[in-house]
Amino acid sequence: MRRGMLSIGLALLFVIGAYAPLFHQPQSASNIIVDSKIGDFSASQIPTSTVFSPSQEYWSEQEIAEPMVLTRDLRALHAWQIAHGLLPEQAPGNLQDVSISTGIVEHRRVTMPGFLVPKLAGVEGVFAVFEDRTGPEPVGALPGEPNSVKSGQIHGAVDAWDRGYNGSGVRVAVADSGIDFAHPDLNGTQAVLDDPNSPYDGWGIMHDPISLVRWQRDGLAYPAAGNSWWVDTTSVDVDTNNDSILDNQGWDINGAPLSVSGVYHFGEHSDSRLIQRAGGNVHILVIDTQVAGVYDTILIDIDRDGDFGDESSVNQSNPTYGRDTNGDGLWDQSAGLLWWISDGINGVPYGDIYAARNGYQNRVAGAGDLILLMLNDASEAGGNHGTLCASAVAAQGVISNGAVLGMAPGAELIAVSNLYAGGSWLDSFRFISEGYDGNASTSHDQGQIGSFSFGNSAAHDDGADYWSLYLDWLTRVHSPETTYFVAVGNGGHGYGTTASPGGAHGVISVGAFSSKGSTWGESASWSNRGPNSVSRLDPDIVAVGWSATGDRTLNEVTNANNARTTWSGTSLSTPIAAGLAAVMYQAWNNATGAWPDSQT
C-alpha cells in the first residue's frame, strides 16, 4: 500500500511538473531566479513533499550515497550542491560553462554523505529521491533454429514495400550495445543530422554514454580510458623533408591526402575484436585536407602494413570503413563508423546538455585531438545484441543472398550504444527524445521511434517504478513525438512478469508470438506478460519472436556472408515491431502530411 501511494504521488508530481515552461539561465550560484508561477500552477499550489525510496532513514544510515534526484529546478539543486561542496570532480582542461535549466523536470545523480540526503527535501523543485541501483540488461537473444521464419511476409511488410512504404524518412533509435554500421547489411542506414545551424550538421546522430562520461568527467578517451570507443588523437607527427614518410612513426603516406598544416594527428583504434582480427593495434591518422587546422578526414591502417596511402578516406561523406579480405567485394572486417572529429571550438555532440544535467562543465578537445567512433564490440557488455536488433529494423539484405532483411529498410538508425556498460538509463532515454540540441520541441535530431530490447526484471513494481514513470512522462508529456517500443522480457511463464520499463503506461510493450508448428500465432510460453502493478495487462502487441535471421558483427567472423545468425526472444520482437511502426509512420505522413505522436 505504501509503495502504491508513493507511486501515485510521484506520478502526480511528474504531471504537475510537465506544465512548467522551459527556460535557461546562465550558470551561477548567486543569481538564481525562480518564477513565482509555473505554468498554470502557482508556486503555493505545487506539493512541497518529496518522495524518498528507500526511506529517509535508509539514506541517513549510508556513509556515502548516490541517489538519483528528480527535480523541476535543476539550477536550485546545482546551487545547493555548490554550497555543500557536492559537485562532481572533473579533470582539468578546456572547460566551458553551461546553462542549467529551471522549470522543467530533470534528473541528476548526486554523490553525497548519507546524512545529507534527507536535506534534499528542502531544495526548491526536488520531488523524488531514488536509489539507482540496477542497470539494464538485454532481455536475451534466445538461440534460433536452422530454418528461420520470413518475418516480412508474416507481418505484411513485403506488401507495404511493394506499395512504396519502407520506413523512409523515419528515425528509429536502437538503444543497446551498439551498431556495426560497417556491416554490409547496415552500411548507410545511419541517421544524419540535417541542421545548417549546428556544428554537427552532416554527422551521424549517435549517443555513447560511457565514452561521454569518461570524456566529460575524466578528460580521457581510448587507450587511456579502456572502456571508451572515442579515440585520443592528440599525438602528432610531421613530414619535414617531404619524402612521404612521417618523421617519427615512419609510416608511409605516399598517396594519402596531404595535411594542409603539415601536422598529422594519430591514435589507436578502440575495437578489441578488430585488434584481435588484425593481429595488433590498428593506427589512425587524422588529416586537415582542406583548411589548415580543420581536421576533416581519417585514414585507418586496417591491414597494419604501415602504409596509409592504400587506405580510403573516412570522413563526413564516407563515415564507415572496413576491409575485404577475400576479394568478394564485401567488407569482412569492420572499423566502425566515424561520427565526429573535434574542431577545437565546440564540445562533443550532446556534451553541453549532458554536462549541464550531470553537474559538469563542457569539455572541448583541441582541433583533431579526438575522434568519435560508433562500434559494436562483441567482446563487451551486451555482445552483438545491438547489431542484431538494428538488423531487425533496417537490414538491407546484402549478405548471404538477402538472408537478413529488416522490416523498414528505408529507416534511419540512431545508435544509442554501450547501454549495458554502465551509466544512467535516464540519460539515454532523454537523448532519444531530445537529440543533440536537448530540445524535445524540435523535430530534426531526435528519434521518432525508440526500440528497447532490454529491461530490469528486479523491479517488482514494474509500471510504478521510477524508470517506468520517467519514460511514461517523457513519451506522453515531455516529448510526445517519440514513441517507445519496449520488450516485456523472456522471463515467463506466468502472469505479472513484465520487466521494467515495459510496464510504463505511455509506451508500446512488445511480446513474442510463436511462428512454428501447432503453436503458430500464440504468445510464446517464455514471453513475459501482465498484469503489472498499475493494472496494465501487457503486452500491447506481439510480433515474431522465434527463429528469425539477424546480423552479427563483422569482427566475430572471417567472412561477411557468415556475419548472420538465427535468434529469438522479445529482443527480436521489439525491433521488428519498431520497424513495422516506421513503415506505418511513413504511410501516415504520406496520407496526412504530419507525423503521428506517441498516443495516436
Model regions and ranges:
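Hydrophobic, small-residue-rich alpha-helical packing segments that form membrane-like cores
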Residues: 425-440, 452, 459, 464-467, ...
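Active-site neighborhood of phospho(di)ester-bond hydrolases with catalytic His/Asp-centered motifs
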Residues: 451-453, 484-489, 510
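Secretory targeting signatures
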Residues: 1-29
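Extracellular S/T/G-rich loop segment that most often corresponds to the catalytic His/Ser-adjacent loop
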Residues: 344-346, 354-364, 499-586
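Subtilisin-like serine protease catalytic core
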Residues: 159-295, 302-303, 307-318, 322-425, ...
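Autoinhibitory propeptides
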Residues: 78, 82-163, 187, 192, ...
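N-terminal domain-start motif of subtilase-like serine proteases
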Residues: 29, 33-63, 82, 100, ...
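Active-site glycine-centered loops adjacent to acidic/histidine catalytic or metal-binding residues
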Residues: 176, 471, 489, 569
